[in-house]
Amino acid sequence: MPKPPLWFRHIGLHSSIRLSAALPLPLQFTWLIPLYGFSGMLLSLPWATGWIKRNGPRPAAYLNLLVTLLAVIHGSVVIRMVSELGPQHLEFPWLEVADLRLRIGFDLSLSNLAALELVTTMSLVCQVFALGYLDKEWSLARFYALVGFFEGAMSGVVLSSNLFISYFLLEMLTLSTYLLVGFWYAQPLVVTAARDAFLTKRVGDVLLLMGVVGLSAKAGSMEFTDLYSWAAHALESGAIGPLGACLLGLGLIAGPMGKCAQFPMHLWLDEAMEGPNPASILRNSVVVTCGAIVLLKLMPVLVLSPLAIQVLLAVGSISAIGGALVALAQVDLKRAFSYSTTSYLGLVFIAIALQKPGIALLFLFAHGLARALQFMSVGSIIATTTCQDLTELGGLGSRMPATALAFLVGSAGLVGLLPLGCFWCYGLIVHTLLPASPGFVAVFLITNLLTAANVVRVFRSVFLGPVMPKTRRAPEVIWLMALPMVSLAVIVLLLPWIMQRIDPVPGIAAFPLPVALAVAGSGLAGVLTGCLLPQDQFWSRSSQSSLRVVQDLLAYDFYTPVIYRATIVRLVAGMATATRWFDLTVVKGLVDGIGRLSLVTAEGLKLSVSGQLQSYVLTLIVAIVMLLAVLQWIRVGI
């Protein structure tokens, strides 16, 4: 069997196959790790449904925390064993009917297991944080059941070795996103946001399904290793043509675009901010990571179409710079960073399209940890002030020092500033792309600058600005919220040391001094820009029409929702109206017309009834003669 491309095997996503009977028990039972999350969901159901009402909903939270902790411990043991034994592959038969053989497989590589640990660890700290954030929430058990469902689906996505199973789990992520965004379903705006998020992601899922079905028909297998072998010789052998490869690639790209909130399917992440903040932590840190990992696994297939790669680069570039610009104009605290998530995932898309999977994974891990910490600090602000409007916040630095420090560490971890994690990611990608792709180097540096400016202007407004009425009596958060923030801040600070220790990508610290200066300079330029922005004038609309147009353009997301309503929504509404008219006028009219014709004919025939048998026989004979004459005429004509 041909080996996958060297660049793909380098990061360990291709696993050697060993007999599971020869493996240690923790490795043999790795398939249990996704089930920990699902079991937490099932254990929470008695409290979530109200079957058990004694002692409140907290036992459901404790049970979820326990099974998630077991998942973290089990994953840690497995990743240690895999580092010693090498990559493994577990496979179990699922369904065998005639020639149909469906298998459930798990690729146990270091990169997959590192992503698994990121998912389970983020779920654990998020659940601890939620105990404080949702302390008075009457439906706490329902929230933990949904988080368990979320965790199980994400764990399965990162371990799955089968594209069909990955698609099935991505659909579960779409469902869980809908349920978590609509958690406070009594609010009309929340219901609308949940519906829009679900429908937007469904568009990507349907296109992905078309790609999955087409790929299955062409390759004959859904196992990633089989797909890599097929893709290695697909064009040369004529198994697929350029047009087919292009359509296949575009379909496979659409699903991760929706999951990672990339242009033009990015609106759902902004609207998903209507959900509880602990759910926003998971969505902005690890849910988007799962979508990018699926795209990463599909890259050996996507490279069959140069046009698909160009589309991926265009989508990533537009999302990176566009998301960073839109984030600068937001006054909602959570939305300012949700657009920044879109921006960072755009950079990951560029790295994947340029076949730099190791750097893409580093970006995902560094972004996931720092973004989770940033959203935790945002949640602390919302919990103590019940406000997320930047124009109504200020002076929290002296009142919430732990939260301010966590926000500062998380925000700095997202910017290319020495010595935090993203600095090394930026330096490595800039050094790698500079000789052949200087245009994309500019995209990375501009995004770094805009991100730094955004986090600094938010920090100034929330923590350094004048004290506002809603922040005058704001206390520091309770220990259940402070503990995960402090723990995650320590991990973010230690991330550069961890990266140097494990050396995930050769040459991670070997880029030259000019590259380091360019990355650090773009970050410092962004910090300086954020410091110099006049806050009072920044929030108000300018009296100059030209500047006001730019402000509105960014604040309203380049009018993307308006464009959607004027084009796609209007087109679908017009098609629905035309279909309704056709159904009522043509289809229903034809059926009703036949019925009316039958009634009129019956009324006419009723008048011709004479009761004389001879006239009936004569009518029958004439009809038969006419029918035979017509048939004879047709036969002669033919």
What is each stretch, according to the model?
Residues S111-A114, V125-S166, L175-V477, I491-I498:
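Hydrophobic transmembrane alpha-helices and their helix-loop junctions in integral membrane proteins
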Residues T471-V527:
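Hard-cation-handling environments
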Residues G56-L69, R195-D205, S398-A406, P475-S487, ...:
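Alpha-helical transmembrane segments and their helix-start/interface "positive-inside/aromatic belt" motifs
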Residues M41-L45, A324-V326, N454, V458, ...:
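Alpha-helical transmembrane segments
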Residues V505-A510, W539-I638:
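Aromatic-capped, Gly/Pro-kinked transmembrane alpha-helices
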